[in-house]
Curated annotation (Swiss-Prot):
GO biological process: defense response to fungus; response to cold; response to fungus; response to heat; response to hydrogen peroxide; response to jasmonic acid; response to salicylic acid
Descriptive protein name: Peptide ARACIN 1
Similarity section: Belongs to the serine rich endogenous peptide (SCOOP) phytocytokine family.
Residues making up the propeptide: 23-35
Tissue: Mainly expressed in young developing leaves, hydathodes, immature flowers and elongating pollen tubes.
Stretches the record annotates as Disordered: 56-76
Species of the source: Arabidopsis thaliana (Mouse-ear cress)
Lineage: Eukaryota, Viridiplantae, Streptophyta, Embryophyta, Tracheophyta
Length: 76
């Protein structure tokens, strides 16, 4: 019984060490998305040693084609 327990503990320890090492490795930029309803695209943030690349396009509303469309739109 003690032999099986030590094997389980060893496997758990190896898993934890592997998980921590995997989190430390640089796998690329962290991609975050803005909250829903806000204008802008996702923002890619690199580590402080790299360039911060942030780009958000301006908000655009579709143009109304004629005066009839005004009655059917809701303004925020």
């Amino acid at each position: 019984m003690a032999m099986k327990t030590s094997h389980v503990l060893l496997l758990c320890l190896m898993f934890v060490i592997g998980f921590v090492e995997a989190r430390r490795s640089d796998t690329g930029p962290d991609i975050s998305t803005p909250p829903s309803g806000s204008c802008g695209a996702s923002i890619a943030e690199f580590n402080s040693s790299q360039i911060l690349a942030k780009r958000a396009p301006p908000c655009r509303r579709p143009r109304l084609q004629n005066s009839e469309d005004v009655t059917h739109t809701t303004l925020p």
